[in-house]
Amino acid sequence: MTTFINHTNHPSSRWEEGQRQAAEAYGTIIDLPFPRIPADWDAQAVHRLAEENAREILARKPMAVLVQGEFTYTFALVCLLKDAGIAVLSACSERLVRERTDENGEIVRESRFVFRRFRAY
């Protein structure tokens, strides 16, 4: 069984159908929630966590991993997974903005993000 690991703050149960189908093309989706990275951690602490999670991810032998979140952790984890030969992806969305004027005459912008594709790191 091939797997697609979703390592983000966005559970796959809340994805739109297009994103779910694109992920399932790689295999069964497994959610591995993105960790909370304290702002006071130094680079070594972040890298240790990336190494720990890379071991957990690699043990599952995924076909691909979606990684998005705190930048320094994401960079470290992406490098580790790519070095191990794993396809690491980012979700690409289109931002659709609608402007309207509310009852007070204020302009209100409403944004909606629509999944378009995965892009490899």
Annotated model-derived regions:
Residues 1-62, 76-79, 83-121:
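Long, low-complexity, Lys/Arg-enriched
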